Regions:
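Hydrophobic core of transmembrane alpha-helices in multi-pass small-molecule transporters
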Residues: 85, 152, 164-178, 364
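Extracytoplasmic gate region of multi-pass secondary transporters
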Residues: 94-99, 275-328
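Helix-breaking motifs and short loop linkers at transmembrane-helix boundaries and internal kinks
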Residues: 106, 137, 158-163, 192, ...
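Central cavity-lining transmembrane alpha-helices of secondary-active solute carriers
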Residues: 116-131, 184, 318-331
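Structural signature of the two symmetry-related core transmembrane helices
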Residues: 140-155, 342-357
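Helix-loop junctions at membrane interfaces in 12-TM secondary transporters
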Residues: 157-168, 224-226, 359-364
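Cytoplasmic helix-loop-helix junction between adjacent transmembrane helices
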Residues: 168-205
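Glycine-rich segments within core transmembrane alpha-helices of 12-TM secondary carriers
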Residues: 195-222, 238
Length: 364
């Protein structure tokens, strides 16, 4: 029977059949993985790990987290990964379509730059939503942000001009950023201490999967001058998924404990390390000062400087960025074992050099 592990149900049966000179032992596993939506992906790796479990003292295979998850943690992380797909999709939409929208509206690079800068104002909405999370609950605001972001994405599909598109996407981007932050909070509160970077890696990969959806269907922009609108309309497919998250995702236990302690005045005041917060905020500011224009103007660069069509951009991005999955998987595992700081320094340093090189070299 199951004592601990990421299973809804688990049973191991050993049958021994005696023969003349020896015996035959048959080991059977019957289990159901507590990983909504992702259990199909985990079936064969888990099957192989259990099959080889007798050959090693530990079942902690290379793809598994450093700490063993229980069923509740596994379910929570799985559902948060689905939410991460949504935020990845919402966050990538304007960057992939801005150049095509500008073409329809007869706008130049300057107007496109203003559009992309205006979208960043949505961070004010993010601050407001996340500030409420400590009083209203993480789950409630996560669902609100998911619905709000997808609704505004669909609304962007019928934007009559570039400025209305910028307005709707400003709020949509604010919701998308709120989703990312709330997912991170809920994941950190649900995760064992030694597996937080691992879970952050899973969420990053899931968000990358969501960001890849606009890339996969970018060829629609080649169909017609207004074809880019179909990418925004695609957000409608996420509404059933959000409803499913609502039915299966529980509120953070840490938030529930916080509310109970607050009611009975038993909560201890925790000290915020201001210097560390300011340092991390400064690092994030400088990083996005470089990353944002490099990513937001990438498609414009590929169209104007490399003469790429929408379909060719899709092929290029899928070919160039898919191998990043390996890097994220390795970095998240190493971060839990060796520390976050050295991994971040190496990744940011090498990534910056390669990004600059990609825009500086003429290609082949």
């Amino acid at each position: 029977k199951l004592s601990e592990g990421p299973f809804i149900s688990y049973q191991r049966t050993v049958d021994v059949e005696m023969k003349e000179s020896d015996c035959e032992v048959t080991e059977t596993f019957s289990y159901k993985i507590s990983a909504p939506f992702w259990h199909y992906l985990l079936h064969f790796p888990m099957k192989r790990a259990l099959k080889n479990s007798n050959h090693s003292k530990k079942l902690n295979v290379w793809w598994a987290p450093p700490n063993r998850f229980d069923a509740q943690t596994s379910q929570t992380v799985s559902l948060l990964c689905v939410a991460a797909i949504v935020t990845g999709f919402l966050g990538a939409l304007i960057g992939q379509t801005a150049t095509f929208a500008a073409e329809e509206f007869g706008a130049g690079d300057r107007a496109q730059g203003i559009l992309l800068a205006t979208v960043r104002i949505g961070v004010l909405l993010t601050v407001f939503i996340t500030a409420l999370a400590d009083n209203r609950g993480r789950k409630k605001l996560l669902e609100f942000s998911l619905y709000g972001g997808c609704f505004l994405a669909v609304l962007s599909a019928v934007a009559p001009n570039l400025w209305i598109l910028g307005l709707t996407q400003s709020f949509a981007r604010g919701f998308a950023t709120s989703i990312s932050i709330l997912i991170g909070i809920m994941a950190a509160e649900a995760a064992p201490k030694g597996s937080r970077a691992y879970i952050a890696g899973l969420l990053t990969l899931s968000a990358g999967l969501g960001a890849g959806i606009p890339v996969w269907i970018l060829f629609l922009a080649d169909i017609h001058l207004k074809g880019w609108r179909l990418l925004f309309a695609t957000a409608i497919i996420f509404f059933p998924a959000i409803r499913w998250i609502h039915l299966n995702l529980g509120e953070s236990k840490r938030f529930i404990a916080h509310i109970e302690n607050h009611q009975f005045n038993t909560a201890r005041k925790q000290k915020i390390i201001i210097k560390r917060v300011l340092f991390l905020a400064s690092v994030a500011f400088l990083l996005f000062l470089f990353v944002s224009p490099a990513s937001q103007f990438r498609n414009e660069f590929l169209r104007d400087e490399r003469d790429f069509s929408a379909a060719k951009i899709s092929l290029f991005l899928l070919t160039a960025y898919t191998p990043q999955i390996i890097g994220v998987a390795i970095a998240s595992k190493v971060s839990d074992l060796k520390g976050r700081k050295p991994v971040a320094m190496i990744a940011v340093g090498i990534g910056t050099i390669l990004t600059v090189a990609s825009y500086s070299i003429d290609g082949f």
